[in-house]
């Protein structure tokens, strides 16, 4: 056989063997601690690793276990806590220690703590020590499957010592004893004290005092600045302690704007009250017919409101609106010339009683007539209505009183003159305008000549005055209206409430 052919066949066999080995190696899963992971995934997701390991090695029994990083734990690489059967199970890994170690140490530490959690959840942690036979059984099983090197204790001593930057040393005899030579090294600034479990033995055997000999650079300056910034006054600390002990809380005064019931400052002023009341009254008169009794009730309500709102400071309340208010009201609301529209109708500004077929010629009303009602006719007034005294006294809280008197003694209510009615003013204005212009009050709808029997009957007929509700002869109603309206204007003086 040709030698070249023999060499070629040998080379081919070697090549086939190598390819078979490569194929077998490719079919095998990559180890969890393979060095290639350091380049592919140097900082893996902790939650993703936990879920993957739980399904692969622990049959999904750790779904309710919590896993998280701890930024303050520097003494050990990881810890698993369990609150009892059916309680919370939590795994915490030290971020300060493991961030300085390769990815292999993170995977092995996580699997180590997951074995503890599995024993807790399955209630199989009956070993006297945490790393007994049950723990070692699962540890060897996972090491064979993954090629990892899970151990009982970690070897991160250099990293742990790196974070122990607060050193104390005893000045007693123990500073010459092995293995510590009187040193206490801690990651936190907590000096040795009675809270340490070995303190009692140290006091018996040594009795020395621990003196701090080392701390991180600029630690004292940082601590002083933080203390000054966070320092609170003694009063604030005492108040906080009182609140924690359940004592009475300090009362903080109210700094806003409050309202006191019954205070004069909280009630609207008298001028605003009367102005708004007059506008509302005028609106009501334009929409419906108000009777005299309804006006009296509103007047009583107004006086009561003023007395309740102003108990201490008496104010001068003017019942008459100002000229500007009168102009506004007159522009919006038409004038009514007859006070009682139910009993009278308007005929060219003169009140004519409803139901009469014809009336005599009316004489022009003279504002200067001074005619008194005879006592005999005053006795003929309607006795069915309740009469009130001729004067009413309104007393304020300060003791001031104002007497409102009437010219006519048969008024129905003592508060009638407190506010002038819009109908009375408009009736008086209409009569004065017609008198000044020289026009007569003769009705255009009635015949110009009246018979003698009709004039005699009109002179004898008695009617009620719409202002004072007094009984007056029909032929003298105009003069009586002038006198009543003029009397109301003179008697309505400012009063104190």
Curated annotation (Swiss-Prot):
Identification of the protein by name: DNA-dependent metalloprotease SPRTN
Record localization: Nucleus; Chromosome
GO molecular function, one term: metalloendopeptidase activity
Top-level taxonomic group: Eukaryota
Binding site for Zn(2+) 1: 112, 116, 131
Source organism (scientific name): Mus musculus (Mouse)
EC number(s) from the headed UniProt entry: 3.4.24.-
Regulation: DNA-binding activates the protease activity: single-stranded DNA-binding specifically activates ability to cleave covalent DNA-protein cross-links (DPCs). In contrast, double-stranded DNA-binding specifically activates autocatalytic cleavage, and subsequent inactivation.
């Amino acid at each position: 056989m040709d030698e070249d052919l023999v060499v070629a066949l040998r080379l081919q066999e070697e090549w086939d063997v190598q390819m078979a080995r490569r194929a077998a190696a490719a079919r095998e899963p990559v180890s969890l601690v393979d060095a290639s992971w350091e380049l592919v995934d140097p900082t893996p997701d902790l939650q993703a690793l936990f879920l993957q390991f739980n399904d692969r090695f622990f049959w999904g029994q750790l779904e309710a276990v919590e896993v998280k990083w701890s930024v303050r734990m520097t003494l050990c690489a990881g810890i698993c806590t369990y609150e009892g059967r059916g309680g919370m199970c939590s795994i915490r890994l030290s971020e300060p220690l493991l961030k300085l170690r390769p990815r292999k140490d993170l995977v092995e530490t996580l699997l180590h703590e997951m074995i503890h959690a599995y024993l807790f959840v399955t209630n199989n942690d009956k070993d006297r020590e945490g790393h007994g036979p049950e723990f070692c059984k699962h540890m060897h099983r996972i090491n064979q499957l993954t090629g990892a090197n899970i151990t009982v204790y970690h070897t991160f001593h250099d990293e742990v010592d790196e974070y122990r930057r607060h050193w104390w040393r005893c000045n007693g005899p123990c500073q010459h004893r092995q293995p510590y030579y009187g040193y206490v090294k801690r990651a936190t600034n907590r000096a040795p004290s009675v809270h340490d479990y070995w303190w009692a033995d140290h006091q018996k055997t040594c009795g020395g005092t621990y003196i701090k000999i080392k701390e991180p650079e600029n630690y004292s300056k940082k601590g002083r600045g933080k203390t000054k910034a966070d320092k609170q006054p003694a009063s604030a600390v005492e108040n906080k302690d009182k609140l924690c002990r359940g004592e009475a809380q300090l009362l903080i005064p109210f700094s806003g704007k409050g309202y006191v019931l019954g205070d004069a400052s909280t009630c609207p002023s008298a001028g605003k009250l009367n102005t708004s009341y007059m506008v509302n009254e005028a609106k009501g008169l334009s929409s419906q017919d108000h009777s005299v009794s309804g006006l009296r009730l509103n007047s009583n309500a107004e006086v009561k409101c003023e007395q309740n709102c102003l108990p201490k400071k008496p104010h001068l309340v003017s019942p008459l609106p100002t000229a500007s208010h009168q102009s506004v009201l007159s522009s919006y609301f038409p004038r009514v010339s007859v006070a009682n529209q139910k009993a009278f109708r308007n005929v060219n500004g003169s009140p004519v009683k409803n139901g009469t077929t014809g009336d005599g010629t009316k004489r022009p009303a003279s504002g200067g007539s001074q005619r008194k009602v005879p006592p005999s006719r005053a006795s003929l007034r309607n006795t069915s209505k309740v009469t009130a005294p001729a004067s009413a006294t309104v007393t304020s809280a300060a003791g001031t009183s104002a007497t409102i008197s009437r010219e006519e003694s048969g008024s129905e209510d003592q508060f009638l003159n407190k506010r002038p009615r819009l109908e009375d003013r408009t009736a008086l204005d209409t009569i004065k305008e017609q008198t000044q212009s020289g026009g007569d009050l003769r009705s255009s709808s009635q015949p110009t000549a009246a018979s003698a029997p009709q004039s005699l009957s009109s002179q004898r007929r008695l009617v009620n005055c719409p202002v004072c509700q007094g009984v007056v002869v029909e032929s003298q109603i105009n003069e009586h209206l002038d006198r009543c309206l003029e009397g109301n204007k003179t008697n309505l003086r400012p009063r104190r409430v």
